[in-house]
């Protein structure tokens, strides 16, 4: 049995410190597929703690009974450390020590294990208020506020009741946060935890209640009618209950910010924002330092309240401005600079905002909003573009369709419209809201830019498991091409330390000289990359890396770093979250691993090309092996051909790769892997060969 060590990260961009004591001997060659489903971290309870204290936490994973925990990986500000990580029946337990000077706010926690590598992240909040742990044995539990109650709704029909004393002359805020922590269920409990919050007086009468105030999370602000004892009741809106239904109930009379205005700033520039929310005094501001995160948004908070009562804040790359009122008509339209962003909000129900966009040269223009995306603002925007005469030339309601590798809760109701300015002159964006949402939280960001070809990159998983020292595994890169980008994008894995090997690939674009094919036309959508661990690596070794894309188009050189994704749910669209860093981690071997001397093979549709394969890792007695060629496609399936058994002599063999008739001419990148589901919802290819380039010629 292994002696557990500690893996900790102190702050973003810092070095790793690994104190790993005793290694588990690697198992004999296995034939099972890599257990990607066991990588899923489902909950952390409690999901927060107070500065200067130690907290015993419980981690639940999909298969905790098979999870050999090695440590906890922590991303975020310094001041949080993990110890005594251990398996206890079907849960994993650890103690988190929070330093007295730890900065309040969120941390990302991941489990590191021998069998599966690194899990997805979940949030743990460091706060300043006293913390209370729910006692499930009590029907009612008395709490003294201000405090944060850590609870969970389990089992079905569970209703947690917390009694507290309140006075009529003191305002109160109660906020039950579950979706804010990304609390969610799996299987039959699939989806975010959706809570109902009620406050009852001594006779059981409801004096306040809420649902879906901040996203799905309920918040009530009240003054109780008389001094006395009151009860907060927290339950699931569907009367469900399960151990992963974790929440944090804030009870306070301190300011609770729920929104910031402006709702974003230019990346790399300091700014001052106004915080608004229950009990927040008018004019409360906070000055933010220059923020340089590669992610689209960060979280900001207020030191007077609990650490995870924070608000999202979006980072942009162009000039920022504030909406000026009145701007309720074309004649009073506020300025919107091309290449810039205006921070705005709907002040009252029925409010309509107008913005003037002066176009110097004819050409395509994109105008879009950010509201639900990243901000979870309650507004549903529509954009109309009008010319100087008032004629509508373009409009859009919902401009961001959802698809696999989704990073948002639902299909976003944000708007995006692209129109062509046929001549220089003023154009006007009329922005209105469709649900009646208004007030301090009804914020949005309106951006305008020249609609030039560009791209963004997403990559999954953010923790790539390498199944054994010397072995190779794949990750998938999703390419979001913008405005008819028809140039190829070079993708590369960069930042790996000496001994690790990353691959390169070219993501080719759809053009007239590259005829489309229904299933295998992955032009501009997804591409596999691979990482190979050093042969001298050990289970638990991990390293950071980044995926970079470069493209030359129209005389411009574009370069973007991929945003890594962590998976929460498996489904037709999946639910992913952007995380702060990409890592590769060595896990226990899953039987033989694969090598190839081929870096490129060439053929035409219908032809068969030979790919040399060498099997390593206890494979001396193998006389055959089933392999699958994997190629990232437009969908979730990635098996290019059916699994095929090849003969081995002294660990070497040849795989006959049949180039299908449907494959269009172009450059593709594939791996050969041990047979598995061939579906990126199940996992990634691995153990597999390093990436091989397939050049498909015209017949």
Mark where each language-model region is:
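Bacterial N-terminal signal peptides
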Residues: 11-25
């Amino acid at each position: 049995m292994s002696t557990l060590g500690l893996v900790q990260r102190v702050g973003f961009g810092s070095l790793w410190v690994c104190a790993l004591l005793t290694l588990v001997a690697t198992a004999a060659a296995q034939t099972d597929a890599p257990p990607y489903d066991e990588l899923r971290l489902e909950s952390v309870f409690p999901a927060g703690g107070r500065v200067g204290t130690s907290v015993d936490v419980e981690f639940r994973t999909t298969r905790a009974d098979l999870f050999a925990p090695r440590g906890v990986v922590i991303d975020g500000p310094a001041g949080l450390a993990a110890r005594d990580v251990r398996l206890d029946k079907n849960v994993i337990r650890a103690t988190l020590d929070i330093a007295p000077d730890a900065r309040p706010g969120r941390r990302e926690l991941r489990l590191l294990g021998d069998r599966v590598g690194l899990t997805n992240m979940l949030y743990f909040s460091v706060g300043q208020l006293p913390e209370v742990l729910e006692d499930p044995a009590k029907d009612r539990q008395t709490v003294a506020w201000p405090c944060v109650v850590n609870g969970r709704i389990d089992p079905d029909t569970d209703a947690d009741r917390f009694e507290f004393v309140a006075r009529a002359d003191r305002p109160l805020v109660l906020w039950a946060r579950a979706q804010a922590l990304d609390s969610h269920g799996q299987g039959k409990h699939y989806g975010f935890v959706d809570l109902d919050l009620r406050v009852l007086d001594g006779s059981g009468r409801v004096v306040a209640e809420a649902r879906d105030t901040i996203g799905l999370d309920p918040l009530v602000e009240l003054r109780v009618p008389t001094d006395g004892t009151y009860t907060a009741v927290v339950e699931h809106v569907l009367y469900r209950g399960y151990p992963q239904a974790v929440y944090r109930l804030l009870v306070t009379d301190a300011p609770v910010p729920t929104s910031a205005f402006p709702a974003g700033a230019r990346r790399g520039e300091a700014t001052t924002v106004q915080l608004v929310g229950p009990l927040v005094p008018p004019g409360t501001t906070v000055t933010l330092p220059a923020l340089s995160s590669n992610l689209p948004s960060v979280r900001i908070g207020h030191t007077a309240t609990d650490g995870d009562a924070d608000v999202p804040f979006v980072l942009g790359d162009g000039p920022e401005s504030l909406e000026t009122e009145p701007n309720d008509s074309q004649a009073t339209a506020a300025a919107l600079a091309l290449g810039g962003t205006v921070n705005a909000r709907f002040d009252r129900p029925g409010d309509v905002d107008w913005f003037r966009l002066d176009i110097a040269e004819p050409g395509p223009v994109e105008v879009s909003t950010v509201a639900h995306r990243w901000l979870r603002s309650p507004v549903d925007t529509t954009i109309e573009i009008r010319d100087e005469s008032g004629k509508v030339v373009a409009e859009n309601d919902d401009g961001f369709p959802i698809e696999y590798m989704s990073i948002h809760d639902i299909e976003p109701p944000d708007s995006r419209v692209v129109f062509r300015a046929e001549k220089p002159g003023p154009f006007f964006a009329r922005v209105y809201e469709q649900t009646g949402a208004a007030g301090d939280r009804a914020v949005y960001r309106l951006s305008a830019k020249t609609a030039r070809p560009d791209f963004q990159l997403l990559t999954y998983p953010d923790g790539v498991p390498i199944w054994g020292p010397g072995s190779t595994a794949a990750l998938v890169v999703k390419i979001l091409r913008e405005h008819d980008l028809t140039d190829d994008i070079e993708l590369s894995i960069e930042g790996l330390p000496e001994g690790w090997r990353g691959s390169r690939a070219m993501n080719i674009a759809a053009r007239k000289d590259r005829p489309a094919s229904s299933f295998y036309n992955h032009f501009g959508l997804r591409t596999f990359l691979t990482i190979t661990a050093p042969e001298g690596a050990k289970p638990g070794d991990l390293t950071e890396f980044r995926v970079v894309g470069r493209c030359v188009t129209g005389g411009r050189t574009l370069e973007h770093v991929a945003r890594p994704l962590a998976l929460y749910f498996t489904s037709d669209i999946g639910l992913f979250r952007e995380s702060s860093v990409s890592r590769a981690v060595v896990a226990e071997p899953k039987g033989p691993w694969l090598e190839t001397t081929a870096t490129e093979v060439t053929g035409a549709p219908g032809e068969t090309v030979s790919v040399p394969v060498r099997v390593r890792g206890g494979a001396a007695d193998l006389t055959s092996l089933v392999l699958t060629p994997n190629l990232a496609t437009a969908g979730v399936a990635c098996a290019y051909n059916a699994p095929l058994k090849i003969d081995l002599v002294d660990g070497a063999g040849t795989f006959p790769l049949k180039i299908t008739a449907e494959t269009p001419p172009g450059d593709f990148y594939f791996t050969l892997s041990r047979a598995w589901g061939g579906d990126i919802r199940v996992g990634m290819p691995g153990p597999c060969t390093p990436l091989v380039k397939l050049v498909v010629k015209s017949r």
